[in-house]
């Protein structure tokens, strides 16, 4: 994961870290279409839940997109890639119970997202929004997406070995920790 920072936003390698099986299919199609650079598909071995029903997976072609939005204006945006998107979705349900309105953004490819128009980028991740990033990598890997008003929960050490549910609990990749981290972030 830490090596991905060497390539995020760069043209040297197209990196995809999809959130579920359907998003993986779109990323695989883009990998097969990409004839100009190597492509890295960063996949999980976990049994990850699918994104919410009705999701427009073709928007993954833009690198980042809204997978779930609040019914009215949001209080915070949660952004992640890969398996962490599922943790954000679960955490958003807990936040909703506290009347915190959440937008969830899946960002399978920051490099592709940065190639979109400024208008599209601002529509998905407005610069003045409070944005919380969740990553199983170094926090710096999402810093460019969360911006100056945001924060990232991530890891600074690697190499742990245990069943993924044990690691998620120990390292904080649970709905409960997303809830806690976001609540703390919103009162800063």
Predicted regions: what is each one?
Residues 16-20:
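Active-site nucleophile and cofactor-binding loops and adjacent substrate-binding regions
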Residues 29:
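Hydrophobic alpha-helical positions that pack around
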Residues 1-2, 8-10, 24, 32-188:
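Thiamine diphosphate
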């Amino acid at each position: 994961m830490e090596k991905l920072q060497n390539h995020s936003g760069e043209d040297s390698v197209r990196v995809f870290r999809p959130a579920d099986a359907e998003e993986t299919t779109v990323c695989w199609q883009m990998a097969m279409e990409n004839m100009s650079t190597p492509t890295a598909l960063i996949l999980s071995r976990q049994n990850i839940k699918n994104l919410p029903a009705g999701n427009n997976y073709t928007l993954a072609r833009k690198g980042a997109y809204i997978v779930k939005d609040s019914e009215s204006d949001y209080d915070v945006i949660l952004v992640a890639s890969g398996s962490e998107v599922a943790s954000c979705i679960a955490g958003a349900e807990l936040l909703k119970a506290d009347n915190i309105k959440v937008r969830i953004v899946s960002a399978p490819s920051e490099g592709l997202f940065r190639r979109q128009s400024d208008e599209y980028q601002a529509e998905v991740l407005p610069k003045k929004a409070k944005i919380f990033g969740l990553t199983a990598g170094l926090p710096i890997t999402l810093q460019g997406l969360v911006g100056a008003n945001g924060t990232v929960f991530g890891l600074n050490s690697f190499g742990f070995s245990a069943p993924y549910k044990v690691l998620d609990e120990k390292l904080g990749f649970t709905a409960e920790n997303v809830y806690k981290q976001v609540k703390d972030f919103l009162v800063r």
